[in-house]
């Protein structure tokens, strides 16, 4: 089975529209883009188009590529103070002279659309999933939507980034999976992946995972986005692995749409949290 990320994202968007209607106002998302990275510009356009579909107000703040750290942090602090901005997203990567960790920590935890703030990451490790990284949230949503029994399952994640691997491991542990986290330095990677019932690959290595590394009937989520001979491919050898997997996400059209849809969901969550604070 091909796991259709676009179809699942459409379901999430429908849920988000209903939540916006119940709120009674349009939540606000502010994105910050530093420089003119073409890929980042494309991702920003995709996110803002998605906001428009579900009734989220969005604005994009573009700063020059030579913006200094002080200016970036002041821009973030200004958005933190605005009542009409419920969620803030800092588009990565930043230019090399800027420290993404300092910038992320400047975002108010209550407005952290990406779920990268240490306070939100810490809450996740303690089992409280309020604002969490969007890609892991999308993967867990897909597993639950497909009726996969996460509890007690053998889950292997290839990739240990703060964006995908580490937070996803915490989310799966919160659901009582048995989780292994591997990476490109793991020795004998096949020995770890071949028994996985849930396999998530976010290593940034084109077609790293071959068919003989995958268990029959596994659910495989390919987070990789790589360019090979002018084509976009994932970290999984899709054509070979799809013959063995119970479900597999394609690249493109798999995890990417889920990630964007979860950004919308988290923006509404941030607005709901803001409303609760006002009422308490």
From Swiss-Prot:
Enzyme Commission number, as recorded: 1.5.1.5, 3.5.4.9
Physiological role: Catalyzes the oxidation of 5,10-methylenetetrahydrofolate to 5,10-methenyltetrahydrofolate and then the hydrolysis of 5,10-methenyltetrahydrofolate to 10-formyltetrahydrofolate.
UniProt GO molecular function: methenyltetrahydrofolate cyclohydrolase activity; methylenetetrahydrofolate dehydrogenase (NADP+) activity
Cytoplasm recorded as keyword: no
Subunit structure: Homodimer.
Pathway(s) the chain acts in: One-carbon metabolism; tetrahydrofolate interconversion
UniProt keyword Transferase, yes or no: no
CDD domains xrefs: NAD_bind_m-THF_DH_Cyclohyd
Protein name: Bifunctional protein FolD
Sequence positions that bind NADP(+): 159-161, 225
GO CC entries: cytosol
Keyword vocabulary terms for this entry: Amino-acid biosynthesis, Histidine biosynthesis, Hydrolase, Methionine biosynthesis, Multifunctional enzyme, NADP, One-carbon metabolism, Oxidoreductase, Purine biosynthesis
Signal peptide region: none
Enzymatic reactions: (6R)-5,10-methylene-5,6,7,8-tetrahydrofolate + NADP(+) = (6R)-5,10-methenyltetrahydrofolate + NADPH; (6R)-5,10-methenyltetrahydrofolate + H2O = (6R)-10-formyltetrahydrofolate + H(+)
Similarity annotation: Belongs to the tetrahydrofolate dehydrogenase/cyclohydrolase family.
SUPFAM superfamilies: Aminoacid dehydrogenase-like, N-terminal domain, NAD(P)-binding Rossmann-fold domains
GO biological process: L-histidine biosynthetic process; methionine biosynthetic process; purine nucleotide biosynthetic process; tetrahydrofolate interconversion
